[in-house]
Amino acid sequence: MENAHTKTVEEVLGHFGVNESTGLSLEQVKKLKERWGSNELPAEEGKTLLELVIEQFEDLLVRILLLAACISFVLAWFEEGEETITAFVEPFVILLILVANAIVGVWQERNAENAIEALKEYEPEMGKVYRQDRKSVQRIKAKDIVPGDIVEIAVGDKVPADIRLTSIKSTTLRVDQSILTGESVSVIKHTDPVPDPRAVNQDKKNMLFSGTNIAAGKAMGVVVATGVNTEIGKIRDEMVATEQERTPLQQKLDEFGEQLSKVISLICIAVWIINIGHFNDPVHGGSWIRGAIYYFKIAVALAVAAIPEGLPAVITTCLALGTRRMAKKNAIVRSLPSVETLGCTSVICSDKTGTLTTNQMSVCRMFILDRVEGDTCSLNEFTITGSTYAPIGEVHKDDKPVNCHQYDGLVELATICALCNDSALDYNEAKGVYEKVGEATETALTCLVEKMNVFDTELKGLSKIERANACNSVIKQLMKKEFTLEFSRDRKSMSVYCTPNKPSRTSMSKMFVKGAPEGVIDRCTHIRVGSTKVPMTSGVKQKIMSVIREWGSGSDTLRCLALATHDNPLRREEMHLEDSANFIKYETNLTFVGCVGMLDPPRIEVASSVKLCRQAGIRVIMITGDNKGTAVAICRRIGIFGQDEDVTSKAFTGREFDELNPSAQRDACLNARCFARVEPSHKSKIVEFLQSFDEITAMTGDGVNDAPALKKAEIGIAMGSGTAVAKTASEMVLADDNFSTIVAAVEEGRAIYNNMKQFIRYLISSNVGEVVCIFLTAALGFPEALIPVQLLWVNLVTDGLPATALGFNPPDLDIMNKPPRNPKEPLISGWLFFRYLAIGCYVGAATVGAAAWWFIAADGGPRVSFYQLSHFLQCKEDNPDFEGVDCAIFESPYPMTMALSVLVTIEMCNALNSLSENQSLLRMPPWENIWLVGSICLSMSLHFLILYVEPLPLIFQITPLNVTQWLMVLKISLPVILMDETLKFVARNYLEPGKECVQPATKSCSFSACTDGISWPFVLLIMPLVIWVYSTDTNFSDMFWS
C-alpha cells in the first residue's frame, strides 16, 4: 500500500478489508500470498565459480601472459636435447602465477557478494498475528505474513514487515530504528496520520519498519508491505543494482596493460621481420621453417621479458603491507585496491553521530535562578567540562571551578537528574571505557550528577566500577522512586513520584519532572530561588525562555531540558494511572528549578583533521539524519563552515534537495558541505553526482540504510560499531569510529601510491632493459644473452624483493599539503616514460655489452672479432671468416652469466635510485629504508645461490664467475646511478620547481650551502669502492679498440 502513513487507521483497514480484532480470513491470506509472495528477501543468485574464474582472465595483461605460456609450452614440447626439461620451467611458472592471481581474485569477488546475504540477519523468524481461524493471537513464521495481516508487537520483538500502527496498548511505544534511519535514540511512535506524502522515514511516526526493534511498549498494526516491497527490501534492490566500479589503480593498470601489449606486439613482429634474412642460415639446417620457428621463440622470449610478471605480486604485497600499517591506526581495510584509492580521495562524506561527534551525549551548560525581583531576574549560569560518559569533569562559573553543594538550586537539580532517570553508567573493563546503560539523554544527566557531587561524597579509593554511579547512589538512598509517569507526546515530559527513605515532618513526597522547556515551563507557577520558591511572572518566564532559545539556536544548538518539582503532589491513591491522558493533570502547579543544555560533542581531534583535509584539497561533507540546525552548528564547531559563514547554498535538508531541479541538485553537490535530514536514497544520489564530477568519494555509514551508498562510493567506510551489512558492503572499517582515522588512512594511501610509482618505475625500467637486450642481440646477430627461464627468475625473484621493499619508503613530509592527484592522470607521465626509456636502454646495452666483453676482450674468453660475433650463425669449419674459432664457444655459459649478473647488479643499483623519485642518493642514503638494503642483500645472495650451488647453474645455464669478471660487472653496472642522478637533478631544478629551495641566480652558492643535507657517511663509504673498481684493469677498453 502506497503512502499508508498519510491514511487514517480506518482507511488502511478498509483498503485491506480487515478487522483489527479478527484479522484476515484464510481465503484472503491465500490470495494475498499468491499476489505478493513470501515475506522474505530473495537469495541473491551469485556468479558460479567457473564464471568467476573466467572473469579473472579478462585482464589484458593476464591474457598476454597466458598466450605466452601456451606458446612456450608448445615450443617446449618440440624441444630436443638437454634443454627439454628447462624449457618447461617457463610456461609452468607463468601458469602458476596466473592460477595464484585467479584464486585471489575469486576470493575477493566472493567476499563482495556477502553484503547482500548479510541483510537476511535482519529478517525475524517468527511473527504474532490475528487471523479469523483462531480467536487469540498466533505465532507463525515471519515469511508467511502477508499485507493486511494484523500483527501484535511488544518490547524485544523484531518488526516482521512494514506496519502501519493501528493502536498502542502501552503508555508509549519506543522503537530502535537506527539500523534503517541512523537515528541514535529510540523513536516514540503514535497512530495519527502523517499528512505529508513525501515524509522521510524518520518522520513517519505511525509506521514500523521491517528489521527494526521494539525498545519499549506494546502495539498492534496492519502490515502494508512485505518482502522486497519493504524499506529494507528496497535497500536490497539498490545494492543488487549497484555495480562495483573499478578502482583508479585497476583502471591505470588496465590502460598500462593495453599500452604494453601494443608495444610488445610491435617489438615482437619487428624482431621477427628483422631476422627474416637469417631464416635460411646453415645453423638451422638450411630450413626456412626451422629458422622462422627459432626467431619466433626469440619473439616469445621478448614477450616474457617485456611483461612484468612480478608486478601483480609486488602490488598485492605493497597493498597488504599498507593494510597492516592502517590496521595499527584503527583502519581495517577489506579490499586491497581501495588502499591506493584512498590516496586520491577528493571528497569525504561523513556521518555526524559517532564519527565527527563522540555519540556520547553530555551536558555542557546549565542554569538556576540567582534572584528574582518582580519581572526581572538574574541567572547563575554554569559550564561543565568533559565530553564523554566518563564521570570526570568540573562545573565552572565565570571560568572558575565551583563546589555545587554551595548552591541549593544545584542540589535540587542534581536530585531531579538522578531520580527522574532510568539510565546508569557502566565501566567496561575489557575496553577500559565508561559506557551508557539506557537512553543517551538520561545517561548524560547521570554523568552530570557524578561531576556535580552535590553531597561531597568521598570518591578517592573507589574502583572505576564503584565510581561509575557513586554520587547517584547517594541521592537514591535519600529518596525512593515509587512510580513513573511515562513520557507522552501531548505533554512532552515525564515525571517520577518519590518518597523519602526516612520520613519526617519536613520531608514529604515529591514529584520530579523533566521535559521539553516549552511544555514544562507552561505548567510552572513558581520558581526555585535558593531554598525558597517565588511566583513566576510573565517577565521572568520570558527571560528564561529567551535564554533557552539562545542555547537551542546558537553556535552549540543545545538540546535543552527543563527540570521542575511538584512540592505537594496528590497521594498515589488519588491518582488514576491507568489512563495516560490524566498524567498532565498531575504535572501542574510545578516549581521551575533549572535547565540543562546538552549535545553530542564533536570529537576533540576532528577539528584539526578537517583543517588537514582542507590543506590537502579534500572537501569534507557532513551527511546526517539529524536536523539542519544541529548539523550546521556542529559543522561550524569543527571547521567545515566558518563561524560567520553564510550557509544558504551550502547546507540542505533532504526535502530541500529533492525540491531542486536536476541542474540545481548538481550545483548543490558541487558546493554543499552539509546535508541534513537525509534518507538512504539521498546518499546514493549525492555519490552519483560527485562521481559525475570525477570526484573520488569516501562515504561513511553504519546502518543497513547506508549499505547502497557504501557500495556505490569508491571508498565505503563502515563503523566498527556498525551493522554487518554496512561492514560487508564497505572497503574499510573504522575500528574506533573516528573521522581522524579516515584522514590518517588517506595520508597512508597517498604514501602508498608514491611508493607504488617508484616500484612500478623500477620494475618497468628493468623490463625495458630486458627488451632492449633481446632486441639488440637479435638486431646485431649476437648469440642469446638471456634465456626465458633467466628472465623469469629476474622478474619474479631478484627484482621482486627490492620492489616490495620500496613499499616501505618513508612518506614525503609535505604529502598532505598537496591537492589530491587527478585519478585520470597517467601512471607514467611523459617525463617518467623518458626516464624509464633512458635507464632501460642503458640496462639493455650494458647487459649485451657484458656478454660481448667476454667474447671480445676477456682474458679467459675466445677474443673473437665483432664481425665474427655478429655473424656467429655462419660459423663452420670450412668458413675462412672463422678460421681458428671453435664454433662451440658461441654456446658457452659465460657470456650469459655475465649478462645475467650485470642485469641483476644494475637492477640493485636501480633499486637505490628508486628510494626517492627526485631526491639525490647523497641526501637520501640507502639506510633511509633499511628494508631495501636488506632486500638487495637477499637478492644478491639468491643470485650467488644460482651461480655457485649445484645443480642450479645447470638449470639456469650459467657458470661461476671469477673476481676479474665480477669487477667488470660492477664497472658496467655503477654508471646507472650517475645517469639517474643527472635525470633527478634535471627534474628537481628545471621540471618541478618548488620542490627544493633554489638559490637566487644573483647569489653565489657557497660550499656549505651546496653541500647542505649531504650524507657524508654514504660518500665516505661509496668513494673507495668506486675508485677501486675503476682503477682495476679488466681489458674494458680493448672491447672498443680491438
From Swiss-Prot:
Membrane topology: Multi-pass membrane protein
In-chain residues carrying the UniProt-annotated modification Phosphothreonine: T441
Keyword Membrane in annotation: yes
Residues that bind Ca(2+) 1: V304, A305, I307, E309, N795, D799
Post-translational modification comment from the UniProt entry: Nitrated under oxidative stress. Nitration on the two tyrosine residues inhibits catalytic activity.
Effect of C875G: In DD; retinitis pigmentosa
GO CC terms of this entry: calcium ion-transporting ATPase complex; endoplasmic reticulum; endoplasmic reticulum membrane; longitudinal sarcoplasmic reticulum; membrane; plasma membrane; platelet dense tubular network membrane; ribbon synapse
Mutagenesis / variant outcome for changing G211D: In DD; severe form
Domain comment, as recorded: Ca(2+) and ATP binding cause major rearrangements of the cytoplasmic and transmembrane domains. According to the E1-E2 model, Ca(2+) binding to the cytosolic domain of the pump in the high-affinity E1 conformation is followed by the ATP-dependent phosphorylation of the active site Asp, giving rise to E1P. A conformational change of the phosphoenzyme gives rise to the low-affinity E2P state that exposes the Ca(2+) ions to the lumenal side and promotes Ca(2+) release. Dephosphorylation of the active site Asp mediates the subsequent return to the E1 conformation.
Homology family: Belongs to the cation transport ATPase (P-type) (TC 3.A.3) family. Type IIA subfamily.
Name this polypeptide is given: Sarcoplasmic/endoplasmic reticulum calcium ATPase 2
Protein's gene: ATP2A2
